[in-house]
Amino acid sequence: ALCALGTFAFSALDGTARMIRTTLNTYYEENNLADFWITLPTANRSALEKVAALPDVKEVCARASTDLDTTLPGDVSVSVTVYDGEMTINKPLLREGELLEANDPRGCLVEERFAQSKGLSLGDRLTVKLNGQQYPFTIRGIVVSPEYIVVTDGMAANPDQYGFILVNSCAIPELPLTQIVATMADGTQSDAVQAEIESVLPDALVVDRTAHMSTARANNDAQMFENMTLIFPVLAYAVAALIVMTTLSR
């Protein structure tokens, strides 16, 4: 019976683990998750062109990302990601409303769990503060994002106190672009492409998927479930073997 239980546990856990991994990879692919997050003092056109010119780089996009306080009740902050142009990399998955037009200076997209926690809906106002100045936004859409599967302020995910919003660069022109996100061509190796990027941008901090916090945590959770497919069946077989040995020794 224990051997049968072990076989059943392996089949069930293996099927679930494969489904989780396939779902995660499909989600990343369909929403064009970045392979690299490149942080530098200024993500100007020259830096963007240097990365785009690399033979193993497929797409690039300049943006900025920073934590800002809001005017919401309580000590609430958001990670504000500012895109220069269309959001072609790390494309948000729309839950409600509509995506931003590239020239929309007052619209924003809000992360779903944060919106639910704070009771935010389409058309509501959300105001962030930068250098003593307030920037009011109208919520155009409720979204989830492949790069924010795990939303955290560095310690723990808490949608009551922390979330993310997406806006266009024209919405906060005072915020300098300091990040480039990039995808690599099919069939290339991450380490090799990262070395190419670092060679043309020696002052940049280059992070790949294995070091990106949310992506790494999501992959670690999937890997942990895959490891469970081996542990529990082995335990069942080990207990069964122990029972047989004990019985025979008598």
Functional labels for PLM-detected ranges:
Residues A1-A241, M245, R250:
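Membrane transport/envelope proteins' first extracytoplasmic loop
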